Regions:
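Membrane-embedded beta-strand positions in outer-membrane beta-barrel channels/transporters
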Residues: 47, 79-81, 108-110, 137-141, ...
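Residue-level signature of outer-membrane beta-barrel architecture
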Residues: 52, 86, 113-115, 144-146, ...
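Outer-membrane beta-barrel "beta-signal"
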Residues: 202-214
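Transmembrane beta-barrel outer-membrane domains
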Residues: 39-45, 73-77, 102-106, 131-137, ...
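Transmembrane beta-strand segments that form the barrel wall of outer-membrane beta-barrel proteins
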Residues: 30-40, 58-70, 82, 88-102, ...
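Internal catalytic-core helix/loop-beta-alpha segment
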Residues: 123-143
């Protein structure tokens, strides 16, 4: 989808930056902020997750992603979602969220199963998203951070989301991160794969990433 108003994109990016700073100053230690920046051969991208723990069972999350080409705005990707997550027994989490993504506003309800270990995180989700019609959405996150030395850890992170309706595969992506981590900073190789069955051709982006856990 082509973004016709460049000013809107600039304003959105500025707002995203301010939102991240604001949440840290207001919520304090009960809030985590994790920005991830990528410089690729086709485009540059920014993602952040802000999580604020309301109670032992309730968590409020804000996820923002944008991906912009260097020369044109033809294939800009944007995704903003606010989610309320409720912790259920036996590693299950119920989520309800709303936001905006190409090509417009949406709402989601989905169930996750989470496995968390010292150096491994696995999350599988399934639910439904409404955006000009209902789709079945499935997601997968795998993250492995083995200890390499006293100060360094390896980083392997794979995330994928797929949406299908009764007729076709409507939207999907796969993001790969492979690198090293020291304390709160991770960096390395990044690869993003995007599919838009209803509009654009499939997109690929290869480059470097930096991720910070605040």
């Amino acid at each position: 989808m082509k973004i016709n108003n460049h000013r809107q994109m600039v304003f959105a990016r500025f707002f995203i930056f301010l939102f991240g700073l604001f949440t840290l100053s207001v919520f304090g230690q009960s809030t985590t902020y994790t920005p991830d920046m990528m410089l690729g051969h086709r485009s540059y991208g920014y993602t952040h997750t802000v999580s604020h723990k309301l109670s032992d069972k309730l968590t409020l999350q804000n996820l923002v992603l944008f991906d912009a080409e260097y020369e044109e705005d033809t294939h800009n990707i944007f995704f903003i979602r606010n989610t309320l997550a409720y912790q259920l027994p036996k590693n299950f989490v119920l989520n309800a969220g709303f936001g905006v993504k190409n090509p417009g506003k949406f709402a989601s309800v989905y169930l996750q199963y989470q496995v968390k270990r010292k150096d491994f995180i696995g999350v599988y989700g399934i639910g439904t998203t409404y955006q000009k019609g209902f789709t079945l959405e499935q997601s997968l996150l795998l993250e492995y951070t083995p200890k390499l030395t006293q100060e360094w850890e390896g980083v392997f992170r794979f995330s994928a989301v797929g949406n299908v309706n009764r007729h076709e595969y409507t939207r999907g992506f796969q993001h790969l991160r492979l690198g090293v981590k020291r304390e709160k900073v991770a960096l390395g190789f990044a690869a993003n794969f995007e599919q838009f069955a209803m509009s654009w051709n499939h997109l690929e982006n290869y480059g470097l990433f930096v991720k910070i856990n605040v």
